Amino acid sequence: MKFFLILFLIYALGNLHAAKPIQVKNLFEKDDFSQWTKVNGEKVDNGWTVKNGVIHRHSKGGDIITKEKFKDFELTFDWKISEAGNSGIKYRTRGSLGLEYQVLDDQKHRDNKNPTHRAASLYELVASPDSKPIKTVGEWNKGRIVAKGNQLEHWLNGEKVVEIKWGTEDWKKKFQQSKYRKNEGFGNWAGPILLQDHNDPVWFRNILIKKI
């Protein structure tokens, strides 16, 4: 009996040792767009720059997406918006369509009238609270997106500001009231991460992702 117990422990410890650690990937590791493309597959050129780890949308360049697809992941990033600016990070995408972590100047952009369009909201679906810990325009915010199975979370500066489960009755109700309602399976696709060009200057840095 002891012999089999020892064999079991050796097997279990061997599997534990062989387990691969979760890899965190820097989506701008080389300080360039080698991991990115435009939505239409073209090379990222005018409109977007990256320098010293800071990604800047400064003029018309179109949305850009990762070459790799993701579904279950944790994404952390810093973001900074211009005065009266609008942008976002989309995930579980198809083309330019997908769930969106809204990036907005809540004070001066006209989209602030809709609570689900304000900063850190799950755009069109779940509003971030008015009491969220957002920085002044021009300062860096820390964002975090968790997409694991049906669980969706948005974080802002260390505080969870959005939480919903895909496919629940609450989700279905919000989805049917949104502009996405005709897109079957929306929110449950595997797809690239997208940085949105919404015609306003925006900055990102420290964009790190790990599959979970």
What are these regions (language model features)?
Residues 17-212:
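Carbohydrate-interacting regions of secretory-pathway proteins
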